[in-house]
Regions:
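Interaction-surface and assembly-scaffold signal
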Residues: 47-183
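Aromatic- and glycine-enriched beta-alpha-beta binding-site module
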Residues: 1-78
């Protein structure tokens, strides 16, 4: 079994009356996990180099895709925080099969929800900065960061399951977003 390192870039989202998060991009370092995850669950995984380093209280983390460091965190641990109780996370993913013709879909799109219980083990406050850089097809820098409210370094474990939701997704409305998931 190979171990994958994954980063999730999540945006607050709502579907119907369900509050959750939309995973805009999921950089991963294990190429063989990309296609099966997309095809089975709709996970927006993209190959990237992920790095995390801690030297004493100084931490750095980065996500590099196609030679561009698109996400970078630089900071210092300033103290321990109370370890939160386990908490639920709901993520929205879209699963689809692009059409052979190049126009529209042969199947889907479908809404898949990830129901996850995060179980924090440690939690520390980090003071630092977040840098987002532009890369076509990975639009993290297109999102305005008005203020960094805080950063935490948390070690967690989790339990999760996926649900294929019984809802209709308008294929014409979703088609314009397909390029982002595959580039």
């Amino acid at each position: 079994h190979l171990h994958e390192i994954v980063c999730s870039f999540l945006l607050d989202a709502k579907y119907g009356d369900q509050l959750g998060q939309f995973c805009a991009v999921m950089p991963i370092d294990l190429e063989t996990a990309i296609s099966p995850s997309r095809e089975r669950n709709g996970e927006p995984k993209k190959l990237a180099q992920l790095e995390f380093e801690r030297q004493g209280d100084h931490v750095t983390a980065s996500v590099t895709r196609q030679g561009v460091t698109i996400i970078e965190v630089i900071g210092d641990v300033t103290g321990a925080l109370a370890v939160p109780a386990p908490f639920p996370v709901l993520q929205f993913w879209y699963k689809f099969l692009p059409a052979v013709s190049g126009e529209g879909f042969d199947a889907g799109p479908f809404l898949v929800t990830l129901h996850q219980t995060m179980k924090p083990e440690t939690c520390e406050r980090v003071d630092g900065k977040l840098v987002l850089r532009d890369l076509p097809g990975t639009p993290v820098a297109d999102l305005p960061v008005l203020q960094l409210e805080g950063a935490r370094l948390m070690m967690t474990s989790s339990e999760f399951f996926h649900v294929l939701e019984d809802v209709e997704i308008d294929p014409d409305q979703y088609a314009r977003h397909v390029r982002v998931q595959y580039t």
